Amino acid sequence: MSLIKDKRLPADRLRRAADLEALGFKTTKGLDKLAGLVGQDRAVRSVGFGLSVQSKGYNIFMVGERGCGRTTYAMEELRRAAADMPAPDDWVYVYNFDDPSLPLAISLPAGKGRELAKDAEDAIEDLKTALSKAFDNNEFEDNKAQLVKSFQDEVNAIMEELRKWAESKDFAIKRTPQGFVNLPLIMAPPLSQPPRDEGQNEAGDKDEEGEKQLVRREMQQEEFEKLSEEQQETLHKVSEEISQKTLEKLRLIREREKELKEKIKELESQICRVAIAPILTELRAKHMPNEKLSRWLDDLTEDLIANFNVFLAAVRDDAAEIDFSRYEVNAFVSNNPRDGAPVVCETNPIYYNLVGKVDYENRQGNLYTDFRRITPGAMHRANGGFLLLDADELLRQFMSWDVLKRVLRYRELSIENLGEQLGYIPVSSLRPEPIPIDMKVVIVGTPYLYYLLNIYDPEFQKVFKIKAEFDSDMPRTAESEYQIAQFVAGFVVREGRLNFTVAAVGEVIEWASRLVEDRNKLSTQLNKIAEVLVESTAYAKAEGKKLVGVDHVRRALAEKIYRADMWEDKVLEEYRKGVICIDTEGSVVGQINGLTVSQLIDHSFGSPVRITANVFMGAEGVVNIEREVRMTGPIHNKGLMILTSYLGRMYARDFPLSVSARIAFEQTYGGIEGDSASSTELYCLISAIADIPLNQGIAVTGSVDQMGFIQPIGGVNEKIEGFFRYCKARGLTGEQGVIIPVQNEQHLMLNHEVTEAVKKNKFHIWSIATIDEGIEILTGIPAGARDENGNYSKESVHGRVQSALEGWLERSFRYKKLMADRVDPPKKRGKKKAAPEKGEEGLETKEAE
């Protein structure tokens, strides 16, 4: 019985308390907040190196579970690095006067993009005023009138020359609505006589010789018809000659008219240039030197000159709706020169949020867009700086991962319609000029996603060459405990919460060890710690306290468990009602309490399971009933095979192992996996073979190897606390407890209720290293060891097992002999021939088997 006492663990070894004196404060008030990241030296070095390398592909993938401070740390480090970097250039989109569907991208020094856009807007208004003044003054009108007068004089001279030449040919040129008409002239009496003067005779005027007066007039049709054919032909030829001459003169007039328009246009251009020169010169000088902008301003100048009348119309007609948008500037990406490089955290990385888009406006059912409606994406805004993304969110979005890789590989970003990426019929739209991209991308993700991308995406390693892995725990030292205290202090200041007492901080530190189930480590899942701080503060405020005490932290932890353990309570209720059959008192042969852990989404709990074993004569070996019905996994099956190996090593050195055994996990209706109950099954099997009862108040966990050494398991705290609740439900006897592997001592961070029960000797924890130690605790009988002859003491557990196995083997031989005698009596066997008959030989072979 000495092992029962010797292997008990005292209460102070069941939970590692925080060293409150070493923390050196009474409350977190005035305590320095945590600077940097706690317990992540590997990740810190990796991130620092990744940020220092500016080569292509050296982007960073921060690997770690959620809640370990990845995103917060990334933002802090990126902002720190960005502050020491120069602000990148601004980018603007402007109208392409050569091809409006291809807007031009122009880079400007940081802060100049919006300035240029504002200057362009102001310049448009200034140009309207300047052009209005230039073209409304007398000088322009006088110069224009002079040009028109010169043209008109020249036209008159040309027409006069043509008229005189035609008259010399006895023809007149007459303008009609249909054009010019050539009419022959003749000397003939007037077609109508004017009114007679007083004293004029009826015969008409006569000259001095008494002849009638003749005048030169146009020939009438009837007069032309009276001419001979020869005369008519002559007139036709002359008329044709005059028509040709007229056409020549008209062509000359048109040339002069064209020259007039060109002169007027040149005059207008000259005046326009003079008017706009100061405005554009100022704009150009303000944003120089920039070759691309200079070329665009040249194109803008020419377009202004060509369309100056549009400005005049807008000025002279207030109601006129004139579109001046093509002279505007789209301040696409703007950076503050005092802010350093940009740091962009895109929480919704859908395709258009990353690459930007072209917005459309609905105008009476028609979609309209222009370069002003080009909007930037996260990669545009992060250009020259850093882009932070969440891997899970990124991979959920269609095409986002592909476009990110493409930009990182080619360092250029084009704004494209997603439909075109899918190969749909392209829609007529803008195709903004691509912008060169130079940014460092930092992605935070889980280990699962990191390895998934490594396996299935061959391009992943080319664009994310730096892995920064975050650990979920850190060594528990005085320094790390103090860092947790600093985290609490920083949380109080940042969130405006109540300060914590040193005891409350100590409870938080201890819970951080429980999170990782290791008394020598602390969890780095700061978000879970922050949740406890928030909830503890809420309970303290509800009580009207000014400080958060240890009771508030304990209540917060208890309530957190209560909110999630409904299923655990229901299982315990079934045990109280006797539906789940678990014995926690007395001793039973071939029955033992194993321990399992049920893992829910947000809660895990331990509970006992009744394991039974039956043994009988035979040579089938150990058979697990759950395995036979395929309810067990490969690891559990491996543990079962180790049991057979152990039995053979311990008891079958001098004779064959002849036993049939059946082991079952009673009242289990789901799958069973893991080898943490292999030692428990072995105890149960030994009990059944040796017919030694096992203490039902002691539950067991731990795996075993072929040599009989106990191996560590997981979930030790949940298992102990789970069995404690079952024992407490029916009343603690002071003899109950749990046997655990010695290696699991370092993982013990039991709750205060269990540690108090152990302190009062109402519950016990035994720590063992071998099967022999465990069997002595369970039976109260020495396990036994082989003497110099290789035999066990008959009163020991191993001796009883060996005796039982030898007895079964002997009975088996007697049984076989008896069966052989029944088939072939001894007298008959003596008269047999030397060569047995075929049937008899088969019987002997079967019996031997």
Annotate the PLM regions.
Residues 2-195, 199-454, 459, 465-477, ...:
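Conserved ASCE/P-loop NTPase catalytic core
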Residues 370, 376-379, 385-398, 402-404, ...:
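Peripheral, non-AAA+ core regions of ATP-driven protein-machinery
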